[in-house]
C-alpha cells in the first residue's frame, strides 16, 4: 500500500510539472517560479526524483543539456518492474530541459553541501576527528539547511572504512546536538577550504573543549 501511494504521488507530480510548463511557457521561455510552484506542492526530493526519471529514460535525446543529464544520473531511480514509464513527463524535451535548470537553480539557493565539497577519496578514509557532510536525503526537507549537514565525528566502528560496524558518533556543528548516524548516510569528508566561517568557529570550540582537562585534573 505504501508503494502504491508513493507511485500515485509520482504520477501526480509528473502531471503537475506538465501543467506548470503549459501554464508558464509563453512560447519563448518559462516564467520565473515555474519549478518552485511544483516544489511547494510536492517537495524537492519528489520533484527531483520525477525529473531524473524522465531524463534517465530519455538520455538519448540531445535536446536535454549534458549538465542536466549528468545531474539526473546522481539520483537513483530503481527499475521497478517497468513502472517508471508511467510517470514520464510528456512535455517537449527542450522546454522540460529549461524546467530542470529552473529546478536546479531553486535547489542551489539552499546552499546545501554535496559531493563536490568533499574530499574525492572520502570513502577510503577514517572519519574520526573529521568534519563530515550529512546527505540531504537523510534529513527531512524542513531541515534542509547547511547548518544541519556538518558533523564532527568522534568515534564509532563506522568511522573505519572497511569495518563491519556502521555507527558513527558525532556532533552537529550547527546546534551542538550529539547523535549517531550510519557511515552510509554521509556524503564524505568536507574539504577544508569548503568549511564556512561559522562552522570553523564551532569546530575550534569543540576541539578546544575536547582537549581541555577535566575538572580536578592536575595540569603541569
Question: Which residues does each PLM region occupy?
Answer:
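Gram-negative host-targeted secretion-system effectors, predominantly Type III and Type IV
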Residues: 1-219
Amino acid at each position: 500500500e505504501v508503494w502504491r501511494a508513493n507511485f500515485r504521488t509520482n504520477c501526480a507530480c509528473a502531471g503537475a510539472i506538465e501543467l506548470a510548463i503549459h501554464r508558464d511557457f509563453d512560447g519563448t521561455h518559462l516564467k520565473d517560479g515555474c519549478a518552485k510552484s511544483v516544489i511547494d506542492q510536492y517537495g524537492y526530493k519528489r520533484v527531483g526524483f520525477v525529473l531524473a526519471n524522465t531524463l534517465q529514460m530519455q538520455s538519448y535525446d540531445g535536446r536535454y543539456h549534458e549538465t542536466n543529464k549528468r545531474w539526473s544520473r546522481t539520483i537513483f531511480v530503481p527499475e521497478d518492474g517497468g513502472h517508471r514509464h508511467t510517470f514520464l513527463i510528456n512535455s517537449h524535451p527542450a522546454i522540460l530541459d529549461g524546467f530542470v535548470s529552473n529546478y536546479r537553480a531553486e535547489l542551489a539557493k539552499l546552499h546545501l553541501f554535496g559531493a563536490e565539497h568533499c574530499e574525492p577519496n572520502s570513502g577510503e578514509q577514517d572519519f574520526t576527528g573529521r568534519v563530515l557532510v550529512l546527505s540531504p536525503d537523510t534529513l527531512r526537507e524542513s531541515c534542509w539547511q547547511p547548518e544541519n549537514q556538518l558533523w564532527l565525528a568522534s568515534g564509532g566502528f563506522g568511522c573505519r572504512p572497511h569495518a563491519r560496524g556502521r555507527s558513527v558518533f558525532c556532533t552537529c556543528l550547527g546546534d551542538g546536538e550529539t547523535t549517531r548516524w550510519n557511515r552510509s548516510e554521509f556524503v564524505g569528508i568536507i574539504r577544508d577550504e569548503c568549511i564556512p566561517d561559522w562552522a570553523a568557529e564551532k569546530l575550534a570550540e569543540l576541539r578546544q573543549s575536547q582537549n581541555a582537562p577535566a575538572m580536578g585534573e592536575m595540569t603541569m
